[in-house]
């Protein structure tokens, strides 16, 4: 919000495909980009009180949320807890310092480090369930007072934080998260564990008001089959993490290979990830226009 140009945050990860590629970029190199997508955003307008939890490079979308809320909502407050190994590994350190100076009464930031000692013992170590519970007990955070809590980082940190917040009484719908480095998928409904249909399937897709169909072979992922048939469906990570390819199964049956982003209630209502979906009936209808 309010920035004159597109910017991205990249943190080098050993063996990381994109970070390794990005290190080789030179001035004047041209990249193709897509418009911002995904659901990990905060609505701008009104008055809100947000808690943001981030670890490592997971702070990238968190920074955008904090900046957009502070700039776009004059009466809103943002509390950020940011976990890193040490001071040198902090991303956007100067940008966060500038936000603190600009919004003295509305932006509170706490650093948590596991390889560098700080004056307050509580802020040493990892951001785990025990630490968040202790911070709540001491009044450093007030989980029940936040309109929403946004979490981004490695899956163990997200799982621990979500569980701690749930124990503290935060309703699940107020806890929003985005995975950067998954280690194991979220649970998938047991009905989705049946084998995929032995023969091929007919797939019909509703996208932008139009209905199109194609045939796919048994064992193929829907997103791959659609691409092979010349149909472009919305997607980004293709790993089940971002939910850009989220759609609703309105007819037929199918299974997801893995799920890192859909909540249990979404699965119960029939939502699936196209990049992880395989039919297990001879006809399936998927609606990408379903909200």
How does the language model describe each region?
Residues 88-291:
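Reductase modules of NAD(P)H-dependent flavoproteins
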Residues 50-60:
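Short, glycine-rich nucleotide/cofactor-binding loops
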Residues 45-50, 199:
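A short, charged/proline- and glycine-enriched loop
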Residues 6-9, 76-85, 110-113, 176-178:
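Short internal beta-strands
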Residues 59-71:
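Histidine-anchored nucleotide/phosphate-binding helix
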Residues 38-45:
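Short, Lys/Arg- and Gly-enriched loop/turn segments at beta-strand edges
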Residues 49-51, 79, 148:
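Structural motif
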Residues 1-30, 34, 48, 84-87, ...:
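Ferredoxin-reductase
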């Amino acid at each position: 919000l309010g920035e004159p140009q597109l910017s991205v945050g990249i943190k080098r990860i050993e063996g990381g495909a994109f970070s390794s590629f990005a290190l080789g970029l030179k001035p004047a190199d041209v990249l193709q980009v897509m418009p911002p997508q995904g659901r990990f955003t905060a609505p701008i307008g009104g008055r809100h009180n947000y808690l943001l939890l981030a670890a490592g490079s997971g702070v990238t979308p968190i920074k955008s949320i904090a900046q957009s809320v502070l700039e776009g909502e004059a009466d809103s407050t943002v509390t950020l807890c940011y976990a890193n190994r040490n001071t040198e590994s902090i991303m956007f350190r100067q940008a966060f310092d500038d936000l603190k100076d600009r919004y003295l009464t509305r932006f509170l930031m706490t650093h948590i480090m596991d390889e560098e000692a700080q004056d307050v013992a509580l802020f040493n170590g990892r951001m785990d369930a025990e630490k968040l519970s202790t911070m709540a007990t001491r009044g450093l955070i007030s989980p029940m007072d936040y309109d929403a809590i946004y979490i981004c980082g490695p899956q163990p940190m997200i799982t621990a934080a979500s569980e701690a917040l749930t124990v503290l009484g935060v309703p699940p719908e107020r806890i929003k998260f985005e995975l950067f480095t998954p280690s194991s998928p979220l649970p998938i409904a047991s009905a989705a564990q049946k084998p995929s249909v032995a023969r091929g399937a007919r797939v019909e897709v509703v996208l932008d008001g139009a209905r199109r169909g194609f045939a796919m072979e048994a064992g193929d992922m829907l997103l791959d089959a659609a691409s092979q048939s010349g149909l472009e469906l919305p997607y980004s990570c293709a790993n089940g993490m971002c939910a850009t390819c989220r759609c609703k199964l309105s007819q037929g049956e199918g299974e997801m290979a893995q799920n890192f982003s859909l909540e249990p209630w979404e699965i119960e209502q029939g939502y699936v990830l196209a990049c992880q979906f395989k039919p297990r009936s001879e006809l399936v209808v998927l609606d990408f226009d379903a909200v």
